[in-house]
Design a protein with these regions (language model features):
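Glycine-rich phosphate/nucleotide-binding loop
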Residues: 4, 8-108, 115-116
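Internal helix-turn-beta structural module
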Residues: 71-77, 92-156
C-alpha cells in the first residue's frame, strides 16, 4: 500500500529509484524532500514513453521572494533545484549529441554547488539543517556568486 511505502521511504537511507505516476510522484516527492530538509533541493525528470525528457525544479515558483525582489528587498531563495534541473538537462543534451565538454560542464557545475554547501555557505532555508560545518546564511545573489567562483576555478 502507498502509505506503508511512503513511511518506509522516509525511514530509509535511499539507494533506490521510485517510479511513480505523475500525481503520486508529485505529492510524494514534495513530502519526502521536506522530510529531508528542503523542497528547494529537489529536481524532477519526466521521461515520456517516446524518449523525450523534461528536467525541472520540483518546487514551482517562489512568488513571495519574487515580490520582495521587485520591491528591492533582499531575498534568500535557494537556487539549487533550478541549477540541478539545468545541469541535468545540459548533461542529457551532451550525452545525446556526444558533446563530452557539455557533460563535463554539467558535472563541474553540480560539483561547484556541492562544494559551496560543503564549505558551509547556504541560503537561509538550509543553514539550520547543516551539520558538521560552521554554516553561514547568504542571500540568493551571494550564494550564486559563491557557486560561480567555484565553477570558474573548476573550468581553468
Amino acid at each position: 500500500l502507498i502509505d506503508d511505502a511512503v513511511a518506509r521511504v522516509i525511514r530509509s537511507k535511499g539507494g533506490f529509484i521510485w517510479a511513480c505516476k505523475n500525481y503520486d510522484g508529485d505529492v510524494m516527492s514534495d513530502m519526502l524532500s521536506t522530510a529531508f530538509g528542503s523542497l528547494a533541493m529537489m529536481t524532477s525528470v519526466l521521461v515520456s514513453p517516446d524518449g523525450k525528457y523534461e528536467y525541472e525544479a520540483a518546487h514551482g515558483t517562489v512568488t513571495r521572494h519574487y515580490y520582495k525582489y521587485l520591491k528591492g528587498e533582499e531575498a534568500s531563495t535557494n537556487p539549487m533545484a533550478t541549477i540541478f534541473a539545468w545541469s541535468g538537462a545540459l548533461r542529457k543534451r551532451g550525452q545525446l549529441d556526444g558533446n563530452e565538454a557539455l557533460v563535463q560542464f554539467s558535472d563541474r557545475l553540480e560539483a561547484a554547488c556541492l562544494d559551496t554547501l560543503n564549505a558551509g555557505i547556504a541560503t537561509k532555508d538550509l543553514v539550520g539543517l547543516m551539520e558538521g560545518v560552521e554554516a553561514k546564511a547568504v542571500n540568493s545573489a551571494d550564494f550564486v556568486a559563491e557557486i560561480r567562483r567555484r565553477l570558474e576555478e573548476k573550468m581553468e
